[in-house]
Regions:
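Generic structural signal for alpha-helix termini and adjacent loop/cap motifs
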Residues: 20, 53, 138-141, 195
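Amphipathic alpha-helical segments enriched in hydrophobic/aromatic residues interleaved with Lys/Arg
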Residues: 72-156, 160-165, 169, 173, ...
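Basic/polar phosphate-binding segments, predominantly the helix-turn-helix DNA-binding elements
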Residues: 156, 160-166, 181-182, 187-217
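Aromatic- and histidine-enriched alpha-helix N-cap/loop-to-helix transition segments
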Residues: 9-12, 152, 156-157, 183
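N-terminal regulatory/effector-sensing and dimerization cores
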Residues: 2-113, 117
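Tryptophan-centered motif/residue detector
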Residues: 1-2, 23, 87, 165, ...
């Protein structure tokens, strides 16, 4: 049995299961079972437990800054490092997962995350993402520039997850997100995002979108 008590309060954490079953048990929510290929996203300051079973008592506490302690607040009794960016009590264990945490988010990202529940997940057949195997291969490497490689891969996994999530009919995607798919409004939004310093007006946006001002308004 194994369990992690997560009180890191990272703005955003992405967890993908590689092997075995993993349970996420939020303090204020229902337990969530993840199987190989499933992915979960947590955000905000909520605390939760990650374990092999909802009833397993956590033996490791993770605090802000990814600081790890045993259940009694002491340093873990046994070294938990299993190699490059690999952490746990058994490299051949029955449960293996990839975890990436964002420690800072932009205002735009925060606006997007406010549209999401605190904990959400997608099953493997809901988001066929070819990036996860690549991330599995890259995370154990220690080559020059590897941090930049992993950061970009994690960004891509996050974008793929959010696209798949908001494509669900029950996702409740915010209006500004769905507007991106509109051929006229979406083009205008992209223009303003690309050049926010430009003094855009209804007339100039309508002209760039190849529609009349009345149609655009």
């Amino acid at each position: 049995p194994w369990g992690l008590r997560v009180e890191a309060e990272s703005p955003l954490t992405v967890l993908t299961v590689v092997r075995g079953d993993v349970w996420i048990v939020p303090d204020d929510g229902r337990p969530l079972c993840l199987r190989p290929g499933d992915v979960a996203l947590t955000h905000g300051s909520g605390h939760y437990t990650v374990a092999d079973d909802p009833a397993t008592r956590p033996d490791i506490l993770i605090l802000p800054g990814q600081r790890c302690y045993s259940r009694d607040g002491q340093a873990p009794e046994a070294p938990l490092s299993q190699g490059v960016r690999t952490w746990g009590n058994d490299p051949d264990g029955t449960s293996v997962m990839l975890v990436g945490a964002y420690e800072a988010m932009s205002e735009v990202s925060d606006r997007l995350l406010r549209a999401l529940p605190p904990v959400l997940s997608l099953a493997a057949d809901e988001w066929d993402c070819a990036l996860v195997p690549v991330l599995c291969q890259e995370v154990v490497k220690d080559d020059p520039g590897q941090t930049a490689v992993l950061d970009r891969l994690l960004d891509l996994v996050l974008v793929a997850f959010l696209r798949a999530w908001f494509a669900r009919p029950d996702a409740g995607a915010p209006g500004w997100y769905t507007a991106q798919a509109d051929p006229i409004v979406g083009r205008a939004l992209r223009l303003m995002q690309t050049n926010p310093a430009h003094p855009w007006t209804l007339e100039s946006l309508a002209r760039e979108a190849s529609v009349s001002r009345a149609s655009f308004a």
